[in-house]
Amino acid sequence: MIKSLQRFVGSDAFGGVILIIAAALAMILANTDWTSHIYQAFLNTPVEVHVGSLHINKNMLLWVNDALMAVFFLMIGLEVKRELVCGSLASARQAAFPVIAAVGGMVVPALIYLLFNGQDAVASTGWAIPAATDIAFALGVLALLGNRVPLALKVFLLALAIIDDLGAIIIIALFYTSDLSILSLAVAGAAIVALALLNLFNVRRVGLYILVGVVLWTAVLKSGVHATLAGVVIGFFVPLKEQDGKSPARSLEHALHPWVAYMILPLFAFANAGVSLDGVTLSGLFSLLPLGVIAGLFIGKPLGISLFCWLAVKLKLATLPQGTTFKEIIAIGVLCGIGFTMSIFIASLAFGDADPALAVFSRLGILLGSSLAAIVGYLLLRRVLPVQKAVA
């Protein structure tokens, strides 16, 4: 009994359970009269950092989303790089699979949303809301299945979600960002060059990559682009090749894993899942905006991912990840309908100033669509994934 409990606490499934508990707690606190103001006060607590002439002043919510989540994306970057170099994405046709899947997972949900809202000039600006995937929550749900999930399937989700996030960042920059700082982007470019040079000269001190990475993160943050992108870039440049039996990338990935699973992701869930339902009515649920979001996330995501994957295999543009089945890909497609925080962020950019009522209705659609995707995606994966024999 004790050994079983120890195995569970040390498993990915335990991290998924903590994340879901944190999300549920946030929803309760945000929608209870005597705790909602405490919850909001915590999220809005200002935290300032001064280093010379550099001044960063963000509230607690933004520090979690921009700083801590950059660490999460650093670990994701390390994992994807490992699979690109020597794993399930090592060939061009294997690597093309998640790229094609991500394109389908963005295009089809956006088109379905526009089927519902294309005639409304204001509502149609939210077309990108169902195109996003919340990688943290999707991985949290996947983690509930523990060692039943093949590594290739997890890497497929990671790669797909990263490309999806990159697509969302590009969409935000092109359609929802009024001004970008050219100077900050230039500094970010210089930092990327510095990381490339460190890798080129086989510098194996992880601390140097982190130091340059902090400069990169700060520049990206100041540029107006989503700062978590810096984490992925850093992860791609940390050396993977073993020397004297040690790999900097593998060592860093191993060191980050418990911090990400048991602290960063639960904090992220707690800070972002507390969406107030104040002003949401049952009649609002059946308006075109939330229905378009729900259909885009719950139907458009799996349809787009599955259809584009099927076409890619049939046209011999890509191959299924080794050891996976098409049923598993469909189930992962459903799971990718968890838009949640990235969708809420895009909705706030699309409707926050123009129409607060539309922002409320879009949140309702995001919550329902993402919840449906999480529950059905988990149940489908539980059904299609083989059960692993317990180790005595």
Swiss-Prot record:
Localization annotation: Cell inner membrane
Main localization of the protein described in the UniProt heading: membrane
Keywords, in A-Z order: Antiport, Cell inner membrane, Cell membrane, Ion transport, Membrane, Sodium, Sodium transport, Transmembrane, Transmembrane helix, Transport
Its recorded name reads: Na(+)/H(+) antiporter NhaA
Residue ranges of the TM segments? 8-28, 60-80, 96-116, 126-146, 155-175, 181-201, 206-226, 255-275, 279-299, 329-349, 360-380
Give any Pfam family that matches. Answer: Na_H_antiport_1
Q: Does the keyword Membrane apply?
A: yes
List the InterPro entries hit by this protein, alphabetically.
Na/H_antiporter_dom_sf, NhaA
Q: Give membrane topology per the record.
A: Multi-pass membrane protein
Reactions performed catalytically: Na(+)(in) + 2 H(+)(out) = Na(+)(out) + 2 H(+)(in)
**What's an example GO BP annotation here?**
regulation of pH
Superkingdom, natural source: Bacteria
Family of the protein in this entry: Belongs to the NhaA Na(+)/H(+) (TC 2.A.33) antiporter family.
Q: What does this protein do?
A: Na(+)/H(+) antiporter that extrudes sodium in exchange for external protons.
A single MF term (Gene Ontology): sodium:proton antiporter activity
Give the record's GO CC terms.
plasma membrane
